[in-house]
């Protein structure tokens, strides 16, 4: 009995392409995109679906998953994840702007995607992280404080000049340009966000008259306002006609996880090669991007699992976070022990050269020729480097790891 395609598994490739409707007898291509209409797409789905299913089962109720993907399967990945995780648990899509494609045919592709899904979005907390840019301002303030002592006026002037010179780098926190004896702050909004806020009298410290009340009322209860005034956390104008303003302290500045992130794709390769060797692994994950994501969703004691660990960027990132935050975050890496020897036999051009370099590198350290061994060596070297860079704070930092190997069944 015939099926959709002729049930003849011994036919030649050319005959199969004709029989399946991909080419006619004259050799003209009938399918506009062969790779998207056959085994290529099916193989990809067969590979990714069970992994995403297992990942969901392993997530805690408040867990999240980040999946990096390019244009080729982004649309299909979204459909698969909607089915497995539920469209209501789609948390967002991050556009990762990377290095420019120097040889575009039509459109210059400069980005990839990171899809994010929650196990249960309804119970997710708000995602905030300490602002890295705010730390730059704090470091400059401390430098000026060391130089000028308690000369607040000079410190504020110098800090504002520095912020203007670095406006692009400090985008999002450049409004933190006021200084008092407690540190750096910006003036916030005292008005309530909607009508119906608190209304009570606040007397100006110099004129003694009642200060102007916002149309929507104050956003703080009267007791909170009194405490803020007592602690010097309210700015008054020259007289009572100017609205008072709360001081928003630099140390409380938070980042939100934005949907567009710029990352020079070459930086992750440079970082990897500085630790390991040149041209032994293509496109390692960026520890900078991983760190940014983890800062928003990973807490002390959590477990981070990477289903495609590759060069073990996730392990290095977690060890760095543990050193930086004095935390105890754990990681589990999953990687098929892909034979680099087999890759070398079938690869071409740059990929073949990379495989050759990887084989030489693994020979130099006496390890088998697999992707896993590259990742394991990176963990060893990254752990050693972290301890050497910060010997006083990493005495108790655990940089060891165990390996579980699954045999074929």
Model feature map: region roles:
Residues 1-303, 325-328, 336-344:
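Class I S-adenosyl-L-methionine
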Residues 71-74, 312, 406-409:
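Short, internal active-site loops enriched in acidic
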Residues 242-250, 309-312, 394-406:
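A glycine-rich phosphate-binding loop feature that marks nucleotide/adenosyl-phosphate handling sites
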Residues 290, 304, 314, 375, ...:
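Hydrophobic, well-ordered secondary-structure elements that form the walls
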Residues 302-321:
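A phosphate-binding catalytic loop at a beta-strand-loop-alpha-helix junction
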Residues 320-409:
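PRPP-dependent phosphoribosyltransferase catalytic core
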């Amino acid at each position: 009995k015939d099926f959709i395609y002729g049930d003849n598994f011994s036919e030649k490739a050319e005959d199969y392409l004709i029989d399946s409707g991909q080419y006619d007898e004259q050799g003209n291509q009938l399918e506009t995109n062969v790779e998207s209409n056959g085994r290529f797409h099916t193989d990809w789905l067969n590979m990714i679906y069970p992994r995403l299913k297992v990942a969901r089962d392993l997530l805690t109720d408040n867990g999240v998953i980040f999946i990096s993907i390019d244009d080729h399967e982004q649309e299909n990945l979204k459909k698969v994840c909607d089915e497995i995780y539920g469209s209501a648990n789609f948390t967002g899509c991050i556009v990762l702007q990377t290095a420019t494609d120097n040889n575009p045919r039509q459109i210059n592709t400069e980005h990839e995607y990171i899809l994010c899904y929650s196990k249960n979005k309804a119970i997710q907390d708000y995602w905030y992280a300490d602002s890295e840019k705010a730390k730059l301002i704090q470091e400059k303030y401390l430098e000026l404080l060391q130089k000028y002592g308690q000369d607040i006026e000079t410190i504020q002037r110098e800090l504002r000049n520095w912020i203007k010179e670095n406006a692009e780098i400090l985008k999002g926190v450049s409004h933190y340009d006021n200084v008092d004896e407690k540190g750096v702050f910006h003036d916030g909004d005292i008005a309530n966000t909607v009508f119906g806020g608190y209304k009570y009298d606040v007397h100006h410290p110099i004129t003694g008259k009642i200060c102007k009340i916002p149309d929507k009322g104050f956003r703080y209860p009267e007791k909170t306002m009194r405490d803020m005034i007592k602690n010097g956390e309210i700015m008054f104008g020259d007289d009572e006609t100017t609205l008072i303003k709360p001081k928003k302290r630099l140390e409380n500045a938070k980042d939100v996880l934005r949907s567009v992130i710029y990352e020079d794709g070459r930086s992750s390769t440079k970082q990897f090669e500085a630790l390991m060797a040149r041209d032994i692994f293509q496109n390692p994950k960026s520890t900078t991007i991983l760190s940014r994501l983890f800062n928003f969703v990973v807490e002390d004691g959590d477990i981070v699992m990477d289903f495609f660990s590759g060069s073990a960027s996730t392990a290095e990132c977690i060890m760095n976070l543990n050193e930086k935050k004095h935390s105890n975050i754990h990681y589990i890496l999953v990687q098929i022990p892909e034979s680099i020897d087999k890759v070398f036999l079938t690869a071409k051009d740059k990929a073949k050269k990379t495989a050759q370099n990887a084989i030489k590198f693994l020979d130099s350290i006496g390890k088998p020729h697999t992707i896993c061994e590259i990742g394991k060596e990176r963990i060893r070297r990254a752990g050693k480097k972290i301890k050497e860079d910060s010997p006083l704070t990493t005495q108790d930092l655990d940089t060891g790891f165990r390996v579980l190997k699954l045999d074929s069944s």
